[in-house]
Structure formats: structure tokens, C-alpha cells
């Protein structure tokens, strides 16, 4: 697995959908590949473009669209019981029935995704997503401004939350799987990358 600092050209970083498309340019000659990278926007709207932290299964290659500033290969050696600092930008949501009673193609009432607004609900969502892999010891969720996107004839917004805190490892292989797969929805919109560091 690779961790990279990347700058996406301004023309490709106007919204999250474009940014995601720009990141694909770092992995040429893979037109049919499934997405095997996660990212976290660190700085937007700088003169050179958008600064991104990228986690990927393949080593990224600089292009005219995206420049790789720094890359390092990462191998996790996690131990049960060890506390770690963590950071996660996520899209904590719940699914509810459409209050306007609109129907889907099967005649069932549509389900809608809505953001979790209350801090206690956000923390409970995070612990559910971590499952038995880790226990949250301390966390500070910070609700961010809505993120807007458009592409493929669709547009929308997501409500992101930045979680920062301390967790304790319960199941090292399960936690590594979560790091590699990402946590929660909207991974193509810059959510789900779980960063870990020693205390």
C-alpha cells in the first residue's frame, strides 16, 4: 500500500466529482479497474491546485492533471491493546423511509440517506463502523460545510464530519482491513480514509 501527497490541477478540482476523476489519471492504463484508492482533501483552492493525501494499492504516476509530490510504501504492524491517534473524514448517515411516500421501481417506499447531525449519533456511527476492530477512547467530531458535486447527469451534496481522537486496537487484521477498504459511504467524494499514527 502507498501513501502519497498529490496536487491536482485547479481545472480538475472545482468539485469532488472532478477531483475524483482527476485522481484516476494517476493510474494510467487501467480503464476497467475497480477503484483501489482512498483520498482526503487537505487544502483546496491554492494557486497550484488542490492538495490531497492519497492511499492506493498501486504506486501513482504524475501526469499533466495530477502531480505526485511524495510517495512512501506502508506496511502496518499493529498490536492488540495499543492506543493510536486517528483521523477520519466521513459521511455519517442513516437511511430512513421517504416522508413523501414516493415509490421505487418495485413499488416500495423509497429510502433516503440523511446525515447524522447530533454528535452522540456521529460517535455511535463511528464505533459501529469500527466494529470489533478497535474501541474509540476519545474523539472530537467536527461537522464541516456541505460538499457539493455534479457529474454523470447527477448532482448532490454530502455532509462530512472530521473525526480526530484516540482508539485502541482490539483486532489488528480487522483494523488493517478497515484502513485498506475505507469506512462508510462517499469514498469517491474524499471520505473513508482512516489515518493512524502512534501517540
UniProtKB/Swiss-Prot annotation:
Coiled-coil stretches noted in the UniProt entry, renumbered to this chain: none
GO cellular component: protein-containing complex
InterPro entries: CRISPR-assoc_prot_Cse3 (IPR010179)
Gene ablation phenotype (knockout): Loss of resistance to bacteriophage lambda infection, loss of plasmid silencing. Decreased levels of crRNA, increased levels of pre-crRNA, prevents pre-crRNA cleavage.
Keywords: Antiviral defense, Endonuclease, Hydrolase, Nuclease, RNA-binding
GO molecular function, one term: RNA endonuclease activity
Enzyme class: hydrolase
Factors inducing expression: Repressed by H-NS, activated by LeuO. Activated by the BaeSR two-component regulatory system, possibly due to envelope stress. Part of the casABCDE-ygbT-ygbF operon.
GO biological process, one term: RNA processing
Keyword Heme: no
Family named by the database record: Belongs to the CRISPR-associated protein Cas6/Cse3/CasE family. Subtype I-E/Ecoli subfamily.
Assembly notes: Part of the Cascade ribonucleoprotein complex, with stoichiometry CasA(1),CasB(2),CasC(6),CasD(1),CasE(1)-crRNA(1). Interacts directly with crRNA, CasA, CasB and CasC. Stable subcomplexes of CasBCDE-crRNA and CasCDE-crRNA also form, both of which are able to bind target dsDNA, and CasCDE is able to form R-loops. CasCDE and CasCE complexes have endonuclease activity. Interacts with YgbT (Cas1). Binding of target ssRNA or dsDNA causes a conformational change in the Cascade complex.
NCBIfam families (UniProt xref): casE_Cse3
UniProt name for this protein: CRISPR system Cascade subunit CasE
Originating species: Escherichia coli (strain K12)
Amino acid at each position: 500500500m502507498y501513501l502519497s501527497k498529490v496536487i491536482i490541477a485547479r481545472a480538475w478540482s472545482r468539485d469532488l466529482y472532478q477531483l475524483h476523476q482527476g485522481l484516476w489519471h494517476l493510474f494510467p492504463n487501467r480503464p476497467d479497474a475497480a477503484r483501489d484508492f482512498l483520498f482526503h482533501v487537505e487544502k483546496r483552492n491554492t494557486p497550484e491546485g488542490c492538495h490531497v493525501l492519497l492511499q492506493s494499492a498501486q504506486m501513482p504516476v504524475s501526469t499533466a492533471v495530477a502531480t505526485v509530490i511524495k510517495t512512501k510504501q506502508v506496511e502496518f504492524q499493529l498490536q492488540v491493546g495499543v492506543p493510536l491517534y486517528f483521523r477520519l473524514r466521513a459521511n455519517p448517515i442513516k437511511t430512513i423511509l421517504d416522508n413523501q411516500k414516493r415509490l421505487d421501481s418495485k413499488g416500495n417506499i423509497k429510502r433516503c440517506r440523511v446525515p447524522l447531525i447530533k454528535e452522540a449519533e456521529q460517535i455511535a456511527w463511528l464505533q459501529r463502523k469500527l466494529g470489533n476492530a478497535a474501541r474509540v477512547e476519545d474523539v472530537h467530531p467536527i461537522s464541516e460545510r456541505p460538499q457539493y458535486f455534479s457529474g454523470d447527469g447527477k448532482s448532490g451534496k454530502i455532509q462530512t464530519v472530521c473525526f480526530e481522537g484516540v482508539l485502541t486496537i482490539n483486532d489488528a487484521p480487522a483494523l488493517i482491513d478497515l484502513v485498506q477498504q475505507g469506512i462508510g459511504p462517499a469514498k469517491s467524494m474524499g471520505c473513508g480514509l482512516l489515518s493512524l499514527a502512534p501517540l
